[in-house]
Curated annotation (Swiss-Prot):
Interacts with PRDM8. PROSITE patterns: BHLH. This is Class E basic helix-loop-helix protein 22. GO terms for biological process: axon development; positive regulation of transcription by RNA polymerase II; sensory organ development. Keywords: Neurogenesis, Nucleus, Repressor, Transcription, Transcription regulation.
């Protein structure tokens, strides 16, 4: 009796195992058919963030067979108008079915199969992976590489290829496809969990890792730009330094020439090179040179006036004494060189004047000239 019960229990266990294998095979075929083509009306990049489930359900190996959320927030169901696209994407399933990669839920059952209508919604989302889902998701979001599981059949690669080929996919999900393909089989979905915004499996994590790598590339290009700007600034600084050196050398030569000229001027000006006077400054040298030039000009002007007045007196005396003038003219005709010399010298007392003329008469003759020539007349009594 007990042996019969054991045999019956064993037969029932074998039937359950066979039923489980057949269900798994049919589900995997339909999931693979759904993975091969992404429905045109479904954009996974715009999906809302997943609801966080308790840690007990995410770490439990039986999370695949737990019932879905009572509120239905864990399932991403498109609007009713997308039923036709879902059935077309799932290979001609039920009319009211919804075809989503990794999510096959319809009015006629899971994946349009009425025989699978008894399974909960979480079983359709589970891909028969173990309790390493939470660890794989965390590792993938952090950018770490994970080794594929033994029971991985390459379906995740098909999903990633379809996601990359979709032109409506977000840039984060598309960029993270290559990174997420390495450890995609470890990022799994449990019952009632929704699809991440970046795509199925580790798409969101891949997007973040690719975004971080893209940020690194941007920083690298920024460093390259800063290096080029620093090189250009160094070239400009070198050019400015060379120009400044040339200007300084030119000004130094000019100052040397000016100092030499001032030294020559000090050597010519009186009292500027005496031992009792120290070397004059530039401004003092120029002022002294100006005063010296003005003094010389005044002395020359006084000499011209004196010579003019003496010549005028000589002409008056010659007119008063015609005999003497005639004698002077005859003498000039006989000796023209002597007459020219006398006129050039401007001697005030010519030969035409009487030799017996006294000093007061001479001073009276040149009374308009204030000169030192008549001092002897005024000093004498």
């Amino acid at each position: 009796m007990e042996r019969g019960m054991h045999l019956g229990a064993a037969a029932a266990g074998e039937d359950d195992l066979f039923l489980h294998k057949s269900l798994s095979a049919s589900t995997s075929k339909r999931l693979e058919a759904a993975f091969r083509s992404t429905p045109p009306g479904m954009d996974l990049s715009l999906a809302p963030p997943p609801r966080e489930r308790p840690a007990s359900s995410s770490s439990s190996p039986l999370g695949c067979f737990e019932p879905a959320d009572p509120e239905g927030a864990g399932l991403l169901l498109p609007p009713p108008g997308g039923g036709g696209g879902g059935s077309a994407g799932s290979g001609g399933g039920g009319g009211g079915g919804v075809g989503v990669p990794g999510l096959l839920v319809g009015s006629a059952g899971v994946g349009g199969d009425p025989s699978l209508s008894s399974l909960p919604a979480g079983a359709a989302l589970c891909l028969k992976y173990g309790e390493s889902a939470s660890r794989g998701s965390v590792a993938e979001s952090s950018g770490g590489e994970q080794s594929p599981d033994d029971d991985s059949d390459g379906r995740c690669e098909l999903v990633l290829r379809a996601g990359v080929a979709d032109p409506r996919a977000s840039p984060g999900a598309g960029g993270g496809g290559a990174k997420a393909a390495e450890g995609c089989s470890n990022a799994h979905l449990h019952g009632g969990a929704s699809v991440p915004p970046g795509g199925l499996g580790g798409g969101g994590g891949g997007g973040s890792s690719s975004g971080s790598s893209g940020g690194g590339g941007g920083s690298g290009s920024g460093s390259g730009g800063s290096s080029s700007s620093s090189s250009s600034s160094s070239k400009k600084s070198k050019e400015q330094k060379a120009l400044r050196l040339n200007i300084n050398a030119r000004e130094r030569r000019r100052m040397h020439d000016l100092n030499d000229a001032l030294d020559e001027l000090r050597a010519v000006i009186p009292y500027a090179h005496s031992p009792s006077v120290r070397k004059l400054s530039k401004i003092a040298t120029l002022l002294l040179a100006k005063n010296y030039i003005l003094m010389q000009a005044q002395a020359l002007e006084e000499m011209r006036r004196l010579v003019a007045y003496l010549n005028q007196g000589q002409a008056i005396s010659a007119a008063s004494l015609p005999s003497s003038a005639a004698a002077a003219a005859a003498a000039a005709a006989l000796h023209p060189a002597l007459g020219a010399y006398e006129q050039a010298a401007g001697y005030p007392f010519s030969a035409g004047l009487p030799p017996a003329a006294s000093c007061p008469e001479k001073c009276a003759l040149f009374n308009s000239v204030s000169s030192s020539l008549c001092k002897q007349c005024t000093e004498k009594p």
